[in-house]
């Protein structure tokens, strides 16, 4: 069985390398005199955005599904992106409380994601029904969206434009100078998760068996919550809210691997998540290299039917 899992991870790695090559050397060729500048300042950061956002959101979804013990959990569905978006909006529109004004965009988005995750975790402990939890997540997203709309009605045109562009989700927003920051956050979170594989596997068994195995469940859940908020918040800050990746990819990984071993789940989820967003961005480049089609449009086209299928399958 482990050999089968290893083969899937290897194939995902091969696909990852092929998409990187396709993205850099086939779809984004330039013939001008500034090839070197364009490559390092625009093409590489765009590719890194796809890789890091896909990997981070997928891993965030996997952690949330473990934490909530619910395969329908995800950073977008349960409102983490909405929490991050709200604090980002407060910061951009200049109406944030004083302590939030002291934060960077990344810090504000991370705080919003953490507060949203904490709220949904408390709700999940009281609401055992999957459909009810999803409805509450959607209500929270609608509530934060309504607050943003009210704030925008009093904002300057430039502020509204900045916020709308960011909310559409894009892999072109991150600059070359910002790339090391997001890379460090995502890679560090992946490393910590790989270190916690045994504890994550124990949490799958339930709270009591995990305690009997010597796992400090409360501390572990707090750590998972922090990692989830860090991943979802930082990616939302740099790329805007991106839907369905964190929900669909972990479920796809479980369906393919047919295991709860988080060593293979983490590796496969991270690779497939990166490949998914690289493929989405490649499709945008094929349609029109200069088109600013929001990433959320294509992730919704692919992700929404799969999520609907998952919900019907659970009924």
Q: Where are these predicted regions, by residue range?
A:
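Alpha-helical transmembrane segments in inner-membrane proteins
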Residues: 1-315
